Each structure stands twice: as structure tokens, then as C-alpha cells.
Amino acid sequence: MNSPQLAFVGATAITPFDEILDSAVVLEGNRIVFVGPRRSLPTDPTTRTVDLSGKFIAPGFIDIHIHGGAGSDFMDATRADFETVCRYHANGGTTSLLATTATAPLPEILAALRTVREVQQNPVSGAQVLGAHIEGPYLSMAKRGCHLKEFVRNPQKAEWEQLLEFEKEIKHITLAPEIPGALELMRDWSRRGINISGGHTDSTYSEMMRAVDAGMAHATHMYCAMSTVARPHPPHREGGCVETVLERDELTTELIADGRHLPAELLRLTVRSKGIERVCVVTDAMRGAGMPDGIYTFGPKHGQKTEVKNGEALMLDHSSFASSVVTMDVMVRNVVSLMRLSRREAVAMATINPARFLKIADRKGSLEMGKDADCVILDEGFHVLETVIAGVRVPKLSYEPRATNR
């Protein structure tokens, strides 16, 4: 027997390929079965109708770089902590995400990957965990940011083969292309279909291009913990990671558009250089998201101590940021206000672009017939009113901040 249909009518639907005024988006079970003008909606007396006049409906947001929220971090590696993060970020319109790890001893990273596997097999409530993003420990010491220096290291095949016990769960890895062993890992993992990203890197243009040849196709949190033009062989200059990403069409990238990490001109420069279709927005949120101002660790509970204050996560000396404390809806609003892009373009950077990056655009990332019933309903100011995940309506979710994990 088919599931009862649920029709959201009257909203402006941002697919994001089009904006459909006075739209109808119909869900049946966990699939979208109709998207179009309300006037074209077939009459069915059994369909439950929800009037969204004056509102917007868009695909659910997909966050490919997120560490935590509401006091929990994916490195805490428990089902309860995963659920806390996923429930919290569903409040911001995120319907699916990559659980992102941090630099730590190997057993702790493996524990997080084990929980990713468990949660994929038996999902928690809130945003769907699509897999894992390995960020660290294979980073540049000079560009490690808030990752603990005592655990930063070069790739060793004996170690990464243990990580590959979770090959099906790992969808993405960030590493510094210039460190010993990085290119070998890139060649191996890219052949397995894992997305390779350069990040936390002090690489030169020539080192970046060798990484592109080895399978790298993305750059993590543009401008952040990333090399720029320098004189590696004085007096001659050479571009760094920033210039390589801006110049090379084969590289995609991501922006932390929280209004804190990057000024508007750098956000606009990235899209002007790369084009909308090659840029995703990400939160890179840490456990302090949604929590009171105070001291919180980044990554594992023994990780780098950071201060959350006035909507920012900072290193204790306030010398740099330590991830963000925002949700995806904030990013989308900032793309419109700071980057001067359309609502449709902003939604694309949070939906279809990350879906294409993850090679799941056949089932996620847009409002189209046959795709997963993941939607976000927004008011006229683009604030989240309700999230729909796999056809289940989840209004603003309650959650218990896990303050003991500070």
C-alpha cells in the first residue's frame, strides 16, 4: 500500500534550478512525487495539504564539513553525541551531512568511524549521516589551525590502511598535499572513489598541481589555513593554494560564509573566479554551536581549548578562529546579503553543489520527482520554520546541550 501523500502548497519553491511561485511539492513516503505550479497539481482527496503561502520551500541543506554542535562533537564517538549534533543542525535546515573528524590518535579516529557505520545502519533522529569526512591528522604543522600539534603527522600506509577498514563510510578526506606520503595516499584513495581535498596546507602552486594529478579535486575552507603567494625560491614568487584554487577550473571549493571568517570581498571573489557551480557553503561548526559563551574543546574532549564569544569560536589567544558556531541557514542568508547573489544561487551552494560533490545528485540536492523527500521550509527572511527529512516533518527540534563535553 502506498503511503499517504503530503502536499506543501502556495510557497515559492526554490528547486534550485528554478523559482516556482505558488508551487506544489508533494511527498509520498520518503520520495518527492510532484513539483510544479499548484494549478497543475492533480486532485486527490486523500492528499493532506499544508498551506505555505508567503513562505519558501527548498531542498534540505547538505553540510559536507561539520564537527559538532549543542555541546557534542563527532569525535566523542557515541550514538548520543551523534544524535545531539544531528538534531541541533536540523534546526538550521541541514537534512544530511558528513561527520567530520579531527586530528587525534588513530584509535579515536577509528572510534568515530565505527559510530558513523553504526549510525548509517541504524540512523539517529535529525540530519542523516551520509558518511565521514576525515580532516586531519595529515596536515601542515604550520597551517594546522586549531588541530592539536602533538597529533599532526605524515601519512603512513600502515595507518591509512586501518582507516580503509571504513572505506565505505569515508566519503572525503582533507590533507596537506606537500607533506611526505600525501601524494601516495591521494592516488590510492581517489582510485577508491573517495573525494580528495587540499587543506590546512602550506603548499606552492607546483605542489598543488602535483596533487591535482594525483586525484585532488577540492580545497577545504577557502582562504582558511591555506597558503597564498610567497617566495619559496627568492626573489621569485609562486602562487600558493589560494591562487591555485582560483585559477584551476578542475578544483571545487567551500566557503565558511558565517560573516566572521571571511570578508564579503573574498566571498565574492571566489564565486566570480570559480562560478556558482564550483562552490559549496559549509558550517565547519564545532561543539560550541548553540551553546552559551564559554570554553569548549575542538574535536576530541582532550582537544584544543577554544573560546566561544559573541558568535565566534576563537583560539584562546584570539589570534585566529577555531571553526564556527553557526548553522547552514545562516550561511545561506549571508550568501544573499554579503555576496549579493540570488536566493536560488544561495540555495544551490547549500544543496545541489554539495550533492554533486558527493556524487549523490541523483537522489539529493534538489526538489525533483523521485528524489529523497528532504526539504526545508523558510519564512520570508529565510529563517527555518520546519525541516522535512526522508518525508518526516521535524519542526524546530528540542535537544539537550551536552554541556559536560566542554
Stretches found by the model and what they are:
Residues 164-293:
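Active-site core of metal-dependent hydrolases
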Residues 113-135, 142-203:
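Metal-dependent enolase-superfamily TIM-barrel catalytic cores that perform enediolate-based chemistry
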Residues 11, 297, 356, 366-402, ...:
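C-terminal cap of metal-dependent C-N hydrolases
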Residues 55-111:
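Metal-associated gating/positioning segment near the N- to mid-region
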Residues 1-6, 13-58:
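Histidine-rich, glycine-flanked metal-binding segment
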Residues 237-255, 271-283, 288-371, 375-377:
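His/Asp/Glu-enriched, well-ordered alpha-helical/loop segment
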Residues 54, 89, 134, 189, ...:
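Conserved, mostly hydrophobic/aromatic
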Residues 87-98, 141-167, 210-252, 292-322:
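Active-site gating loops and adjacent loop-to-helix segments of metal-dependent hydrolytic enzymes
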